[in-house]
Amino acid sequence: MFLTLIAAIISFMVSAFTMPYFIKFYQLKKIGGQQMHEDVKQHLAKAGTPTMGGTVFLLVATAVSLLVSLFSIKNTQSLALISGILSIVVIYGIIGFLDDFLKIFKQINEGLTAKQKLALQLVGGLMFYFLHVSPSGISSINVFGYQLPLGIFYLFFVLFWVVGFSNAVNLTDGIDGLASISVVISLVTYGVIAYVQSQFDVLLLIGAMIGALLGFFCFNHKPAKVFMGDVGSLALGAMLAAISIALRQEWTLLIIGIVYVLETSSVMLQVSYFKYTKKKYGEGRRIFRMTPFHHHLELGGLSGKGKKWSEWQVDAFLWGVGSLASLLVLAILYVF
């Protein structure tokens, strides 16, 4: 526990100290910044804001985790666990970095195509499974203490879980501070679970990432001076999925990650309903004002027809939802 606290403090200090230099370098080199949705007019002023800040907090958290773990790793099993989680973080961070690089440096608006990104994510998921999950012998999902055997189909579950939540966190990263603190809330919850399970190596990784993210948030809260980019969001989503697998609490991510599930579901519902109504009525209709869901809240509150919400209001609401969901999981696991 002490080493976890040390890792969190070091990560926070290094991340908070380094980020201004990253922002300044970005601005001095006149690198193109984040592009904004024209439909949300209050976001247009953010055009050109430095992005790819996730590069900094990922490097910091990874380096600190490895450094501090040298004093705590006692066996090869712990080393395999840490390397497994860090490997998926690094792999998905590289995928996100490539996507951001193409958008910003090569001026390719869409970055990687959807098919290219999915292919790389699947390759990363396969590497994670065959190098770290399969050797551990895990082939079942723990649901409320009951082991649901999947056999070889656990491979497909891992791919779905990692790819799905990496993209879900990516969709959540749409307004200042939303994704960073939402992930912190999720990580704190998994930190409690790891502590109860005496999984102190996982707890150390969680502490390092929480510290690095809080250092990043010092510059990502409204008005944001930097965004995490795909390099950060894809890696964070994959990390949450990997941690839920490592702790054998996969099902909890559906509740702990309710914000990411809500954001992703809103997009899927919107697209499906639009296509259905266009085919049936000749014109597409929408359920939400705009998706992902945080934009719907911005444009008209919960109903979509009320007063516009500020980014702080949206943040507070979704952080609150995530916090309550996390408390519910802890209550289910350790109270009821």
Curated annotation (Swiss-Prot):
It holds the Pfam family MraY_sig1. Pathway: Cell wall biogenesis; peptidoglycan biosynthesis. Its main location: membrane. Its cofactor is Mg(2+). It comes from the Bacteria. GO terms for molecular function: metal ion binding; phospho-N-acetylmuramoyl-pentapeptide-transferase activity. It is a multi-pass membrane protein. It is an enzyme of class 2 (transferase). GO terms for cellular component: plasma membrane. The chain crosses the membrane at residues 3-23, 53-73, 78-98, 118-138, 143-163, 174-194, 200-220, 226-246, 251-271, 316-336. One of its GO terms (biological process) is regulation of cell shape. Keywords: Cell cycle, Cell division, Cell membrane, Cell shape, Cell wall biogenesis/degradation, Magnesium, Membrane, Metal-binding, Peptidoglycan synthesis, Transferase, Transmembrane, Transmembrane helix. Its EC number is 2.7.8.13. It is found in: Cell membrane. It catalyses: UDP-N-acetyl-alpha-D-muramoyl-L-alanyl-gamma-D-glutamyl-L-lysyl-D-alanyl-D-alanine + di-trans,octa-cis-undecaprenyl phosphate = Mur2Ac(oyl-L-Ala-gamma-D-Glu-L-Lys-D-Ala-D-Ala)-di-trans,octa-cis-undecaprenyl diphosphate + UMP. Catalyzes the initial step of the lipid cycle reactions in the biosynthesis of the cell wall peptidoglycan: transfers peptidoglycan precursor phospho-MurNAc-pentapeptide from UDP-MurNAc-pentapeptide onto the lipid carrier undecaprenyl phosphate, yielding undecaprenyl-pyrophosphoryl-MurNAc-pentapeptide, known as lipid I. NCBIfam families: mraY. Belongs to the glycosyltransferase 4 family. MraY subfamily. This is Phospho-N-acetylmuramoyl-pentapeptide-transferase. It comes from Streptococcus pyogenes serotype M1.
